[in-house]
């Protein structure tokens, strides 16, 4: 009997988008994962950096956009968008567009003849012909090499915290200058911690005046994807075009499109509130009892209770422990990013990657919710051909 089962691993914006497009096309798929789990682990008072127009999870007809949700439930347009609004919207999208989700985790994925074998956490197993890996960014937390030896009592990543109240009256260094670092610093300060922000570069704030003041003609400067500064944003808005650029140009555009920077609305909660040491790195970190002793590149030292990393994420499929090493070894990659064809298919037939791992080939759009539409559409189109 022919096995034609499709499995989507992950139920965040990318997994939900792929599953929604497949379902709308009449193509059945098993979707595994807890809906919006990564987003639900964030501090409840968080606001999102992306604009309202860039936060719709994708279904092919646009029936379940954020605007549709807003109109149906009387949720007013607002920027910045509160995390809770996005969580409520994501729950509604899943219930409408992908109602049948199995919240069991995939424990292992291996190759099985011309298909794949999946073992689930609850002891069940599934055989699939096609697999889409859409596991989000949580596994890719970027830990600097010279800090990774510190224990969890002294070192954590911003994604590890939903509540910072346990840091009240603690001395905490936040490392980084992007949105996650700046917001972590603000939340720590507001929770009563003695916070210092240390960044290898300057602290930069995103200037959105052109976006808000140009009215309808803003679309000349800003594509709907809204990723990157004017000029660069149009070059990264089309993933198929981005894929055609040379490696050197893709790397350059990616760096220019997504630089460490904070949303302007966060600025009053940081500037003048939190001591900041820019253009500085931690050169050495030593565990001393219950403290971390830090040596900085400017010659100064710190003795702190904890370090929170706001150092973002670095996609590397080798950290996906559920993928069998033998299968992973067959995936052609560049610095941990799979090399994908136009359908997001890896060098292993019928194994697809979406989201952050696809960024090397398709660009920085893959790191944002707005980027989910393109791979979902491509994969559904491809599966209809097979």
Question: Where would I find each of the regions flagged by the language model?
Answer:
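Flavin (primarily FAD) cofactor-binding/catalytic cores of flavoenzymes
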Residues: 1-36, 40, 78-179, 183-386
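Flavin (FAD/FMN) cofactor-binding and adjacent substrate-gating region
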Residues: 40-72, 224-243
């Amino acid at each position: 009997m022919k096995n034609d089962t499709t499995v989507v691993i992950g139920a965040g914006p990318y997994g939900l988008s792929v599953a929604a497009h497949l379902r709308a096309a009449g193509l059945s798929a098993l979707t595994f994962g807890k809906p919006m789990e990564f987003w639900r682990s964030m501090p409840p008072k968080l606001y999102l950096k992306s604009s309202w127009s860039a936060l719709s999870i994708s279904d092919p007809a646009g029936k379940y956009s954020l605007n549709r949700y807003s109109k149906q439930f009387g949720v007013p347009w607002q920027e910045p968008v509160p995390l809770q609004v996005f969580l409520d919207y994501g729950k509604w999208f899943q219930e409408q567009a992908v109602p049948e989700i199995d919240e069991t985790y995939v424990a292992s994925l291996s190759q099985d003849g011309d298909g794949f074998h999946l073992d689930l956490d609850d002891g069940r197993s599934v055989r699939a012909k096609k697999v889409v890996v859409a596991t989000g960014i949580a596994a890719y937390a970027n830990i600097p090499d010279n800090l990774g030896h510190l224990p969890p009592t002294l070192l954590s990543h911003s994604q590890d915290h939903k509540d910072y109240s346990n840091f009240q009256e603690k001395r905490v260094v936040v490392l980084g200058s992007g949105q996650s670092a700046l917001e972590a610093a603000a939340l720590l300060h507001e929770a009563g911690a003695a916070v210092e922000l240390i960044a290898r570069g300057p602290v930069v704030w995103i200037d959105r005046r052109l976006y808000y003041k140009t009215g309808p003609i803003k679309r000349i400067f800003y594509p709907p994807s809204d990723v990157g500064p004017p000029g660069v944003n149009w070059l990264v808005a089309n993933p198929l075009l981005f894929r055609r650029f040379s490696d050197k140009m893709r790397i350059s555009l990616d760096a220019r499109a997504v630089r460490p920077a904070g949303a302007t609305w966060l600025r009053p909660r940081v500037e003048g509130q939190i001591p900041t040491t820019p253009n500085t790195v931690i050169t050495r970190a030593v565990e001393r009892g219950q403290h971390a002793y830090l040596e900085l590149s400017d010659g100064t030292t710190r003795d702190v209770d904890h370090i929170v990393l706001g150092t973002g994420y670095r996609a590397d499929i080798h950290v996906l422990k559920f993928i069998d090493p033998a299968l992973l070894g067959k995936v052609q990659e560049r610095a941990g990013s799979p090399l994908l064809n136009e359908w997001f298919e890896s060098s292993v037939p019928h194994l697809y990657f979406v989201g952050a791992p696809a960024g090397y080939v398709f660009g920085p759009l893959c790191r944002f919710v707005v980027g989910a539409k393109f791979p979902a559409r491509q994969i559904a189109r491809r599966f209809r051909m097979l």
